[in-house]
């Protein structure tokens, strides 16, 4: 379950937590009245062995609605997440209401509220559901389950991006991914928050040993709340969690937000996963389902009756609470989907398969090309494409005012691009090899779309160069610009990029051998978060 509170509620909860957590929890831990619920590691296989045969849920908020009226009926499950609101608004309730968008399009949609992904995936496999809402992260986690069950699935629609609701909090001295080495890191097991930590570790320039040590020694908790409480009680140095704990960390002097999804639209994306058999048999119904949800976007922060009726967690919420929750998820447009389903969604799915494998779980990366399709989005192009634009997900831009701040900010994540240039020029010596090397950084840049990218060119020290190193500075700056231009040609906004020519001032090794000189002729790519 994912949600955000109003600003007033965040402040109140932060004050309460500051008192209760710091005083009450610490006292409780010392006295033995409160036990620290740190989970033993379990594998996905062990969890599924217990839960795979479960078709009912003890969750009191589960609401099943699966009446199949006709071939134009879709049975879909959603968890209690604000990002599904456009689907609910298009439907008008758990069932399609007369005069609603879906009713006008001629389809019936039955919504089941299921917070348990095991239960919803079982129902999808059994055929009780035609579709279910999952994050791309969760879809990767469930991939082998669907494959072993012999059910093909597709995700033809990304509904929303997480927009700051999930993140990583840390002690003040932990500022980069490299600082995670040796730190105690608390994560909620099998959660989107856990995948954030592992994704950053996997995409860092840490050694394989350091990566393995971090991942193998994650401290597992049952929920994001428990991970956060352990952090504020001093039991862990870092915690992957969600709101309101991110705000609490931001308001304290000895800790901070290391990362939140406000700096990345793509790390946590939600979409609707369909049974491929259903979609193949009923393409027009799927088309209209997507069309109706997209057309309901203008109701997102304006109409509230339907979501109050459908989702128990919002049933007593004020309109202000719901609007504040809406800020935690940004709805996608038709244009976003056309781009995502052939681009970032595939990158993210593949990365998440690697994440799950890193922590010992099964995931099928080979399903990436069969799961994501823009066929259905293209089928409704005439309804949207002439006027649609992508959501502007850029949160930060390089300006003259913040260039120095960018330079002074330590990079959250960085790496070295081993790109070689023709001697004394800024031209790639091997364009194909350079492309392969730089593409991995472009993929990261597309995922971390709310970060500033610093590209720093470096040369090896030349004993015959001028004392001020002006030639090397100019050459290294030109080489950084060459890398920047490659980024721009591949879809990265120039507004996000700052280039630096270090000359020969920052060698990484002694310049005593040809191998070492080659190591010093490098381009460093860093991803930085600049607070507004």
Enumerate the predicted regions with their spans:
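N-terminal hydrophobic or amphipathic helices and topogenic motifs
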Residues: 2-117, 125, 333-411
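Short, glycine-/small- and polar/acidic-enriched structural segments
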Residues: 33-221, 237-243, 266
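Secondary-structure end/capping motifs
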Residues: 280-364
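Periplasmic peptidoglycan-binding/tethering modules of Gram-negative envelope proteins
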Residues: 375-453, 529-532
